[in-house]
A protein has these predicted regions:
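Short beta-turn/strand-loop junction motif enriched in small, turn-promoting residues
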Residues: 78-81, 224, 271
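Signature of N6-adenine DNA methyltransferases within the class I
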Residues: 1-206, 230, 240, 244-247, ...
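Acidic/histidine-rich catalytic neighborhood
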Residues: 85-93, 333-335, 349, 353-356, ...
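Short Ser/Thr-interspersed hydrophobic loop/turn segments at strand-loop and sheet-helix junctions
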Residues: 219, 257-275, 302-316
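Contiguous C-terminal substrate-recognition/catalytic subdomains in enzyme active sites
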Residues: 205-257, 265
Length: 373
């Protein structure tokens, strides 16, 4: 239960007593468990896995690494309990040691097993055979090598070492979320719902918006698609729309100076697969169509890297959740990219092919005729 659901009195009480763990009731119990354990004692809990990775629990992870240890963990993931189906509830069973030690904890990665019975059998097999492929040994203090200190027990020493020598993606491209309208039903539409003459496709700067057009292309994320596409939405962003949105409690006009700039974009919700696309200038972006803004020289190389399995592997270390937010992506390590000219040519080809595919069907505002004709 998140802190926002605790109620005013209880929320304040928990925040005062569990300053590193108050964001969720289950993490407050983790902290309380240390207080109830004897020195060198243990506490064991089944909790949501969110504390292992999310930025809001970074202080709790830091406290565990500084003052305590993880003796063992069965990382259950989703579908750990037959009575709770679906992909939403992700859990972990952890034995915490109330002492700082250098003993490597035992970790059982059961997240890829799809039922309670499979996870039970997998745990028993790992106990009998440490070479099974889902058993790991790791010292909790080693997680501090990764930005945000996620409990990425499966990370190799080589992978963790990259973070110390590489430049972060955030330094090169400044990823960020965009505008929250406060009322998408009124202010974000599909482009075919509006008169095409009332949509501006060529605006390059907020201050130079035309006064005679109300709608502008808007990157709003969308389904899995690499390189180019998901260009379906427009946002009302003329002066009258902005003035109306300002009256809405949910309106958040963030990063206005980046609107209409060329960007790399992706969807906040990924279903486990990341896909990154090139957006030329002329587009707005909202809070779920997150975007990054590298310079022209590094644009294609960074887009190429983001669409690789290597980037996906590092993203799973940083945030193995259904969300791919700007803060997590900013932590991706970027090493020097060799063969830049070849990469640029290949990326241009990928964008060209995917654009041709997107424009071949009626969802594209650039559609002219079906490719079979």
């Amino acid at each position: 239960m998140g802190s926002s659901s605790l109620g005013k009195w209880m929320g304040a009480w928990v925040k005062k007593r569990y300053t590193e763990a108050y964001r969720d009731l289950c993490t407050s119990f983790i902290d309380r468990g240390f207080g109830m354990s004897a020195n060198n004692g243990y506490s064991a809990m089944v909790t949501m896995q969110s504390w292992m990775f999310l930025g809001s629990f970074e202080k709790l992870r830091g406290k565990i690494m500084r003052n305590h240890s993880i003796s063992s963990m069965a990382h259950l993931g989703t579908r750990a309990f037959g009575a709770i189906g679906g992909e939403v509830v992700s859990t972990t069973a952890t034995v915490f040691a109330n002492a700082k030690n250098e003993v490597k904890g035992a970790y059982f990665r059961l997240v890829d097993m799809v039922s309670e019975e499979e996870k039970q059998a997998g745990l028993l097999e790992a106990l009998a055979n440490h070479e099974c492929g889902w058993f790991y040994r790791a010292n909790a203090s080693g997680f501090e090598a990764i930005p945000g200190s996620p409990i990425a027990y499966w990370a190799s020493n080589a992978a963790m070492g990259v973070f110390s020598s590489a430049v972060s993606f955030g330094e090169l491209a400044n990823p960020s979320a965009g505008i929250t309208t406060g009322d998408n039903a009124s202010y974000i539409h599909y482009w075919w719902e509006e008169e095409i003459s009332n949509i501006s496709f060529t605006t390059n700067d907020f201050s130079s918006r035309p006064t005679d057009q109300k709608w502008f292309p808007c990157n709003k994320g969308g389904a899995f698609r690499k390189w180019y596409g998901n260009r379906e939405n427009v946002m009302a962003f003329d002066d009258s729309a902005i003035n109306a949105m300002r009256k809405l409690p949910g309106y958040r006009p963030v990063n206005i100076e980046k609107q209409f700039k060329a960007s790399i974009s992706w969807s906040d919700i990924t279903s486990g697969r990341n896909s990154f696309r090139a957006n030329g200038s002329g587009n707005l972006y909202d809070h779920v169509g997150i975007s990054a803004f590298p310079d022209e020289e590094s644009f294609n190389c960074l887009l190429a890297f983001l669409n690789t399995s290597v980037a996906s592997t590092f993203m799973i270390l940083l945030a193995p959740t259904l969300h791919c937010n700007a803060g997590d992506l900013a932590k991706l390590p970027i090493v020097e990219i060799k063969e830049k000219n070849s990469v640029n040519e290949l990326v241009n080809d990928c964008i060209k092919l995917c654009r041709r595919d997107w424009d071949a069907f009626e969802l594209s505002w650039a559609f002219r005729y079906h490719p079979m004709i």
